[in-house]
Amino acid sequence: MLEIEKKGAYMSIFSAIEAYLVLQGNKYISPDKAGELREMMLDFKQKGQAARAEFLDLVKQFQRFYPKLTLERTSNWMNQAQILRPHFWNYLRGCGDVTEPMFALRLYGNPKDFGVSLEVSFIERKKDETSLTKQNRVLQVPIAVPVYYLAQINGVSQRFTGTEENRKYLSQQVKTGQVRKVLVKYDVDLAQATSIRQVLDKLQATMTTLIPFYEATRELYEV
């Protein structure tokens, strides 16, 4: 599938995701309780479901290259407070328990500039007493741009460029308890993609880059 040019503007091949990103942060109300907003709520629901399906299709196509990875459930199109949430994510679990660090695909950005990041992380609500220790072993692996860190400091996620200096800094901050957890991430553009194949090729290259970080979280690397 190729980009379609229309009246001087390009239509993204991920048109459902692009359309739903516009609605980020809106409040969803059950159509039966929405009164005169009923049609708007039905539109929100339709766009949310379509975007989620489009994202899930990409995830499934990617997962076919890695049949040993098991797909966890894709995030919903709204959160528990019924706020529209277009930045979907999907974990891909390898061997081991669901508490283990794993791969995840996560949407990011806005309608004009969006993409999907591949990351090594874990599911917070399923973590155990060893999850954080295993996750932070990603700092044992040498890093280079465009891979980057996302570190949680005082409950806030902060991005750090993938440099040796930042690797050493974050390692020290983890030891002193200033940093709780560190993810490694690699962004892949979707907004300007011209084909699904292009995106999948890029994601496979990204996976190759991140595998050493994932392997560092395994029991084999315990010291």
Predicted regions and their residues:
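Charged, low-complexity intrinsically disordered regions
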Residues: 5-40, 121-223
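Short, mixed-charge, low-aromatic patches
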Residues: 12-15, 45-46, 87-94, 162-164
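Active-site acidic/histidine clusters and adjacent loop/turn architecture
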Residues: 25-66
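Conserved aromatic-histidine-acidic binding/catalytic patches
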Residues: 43-50, 54, 93, 194-198, ...
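Short N-terminal edge-element motif at the start of the domain
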Residues: 56-86, 92
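Short, surface-exposed, charge-dense and proline/glycine-enriched linear segments
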Residues: 72, 95-109, 147-153, 179-183
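Aromatic- and glycine-enriched beta-alpha-beta binding-site module
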Residues: 78-142
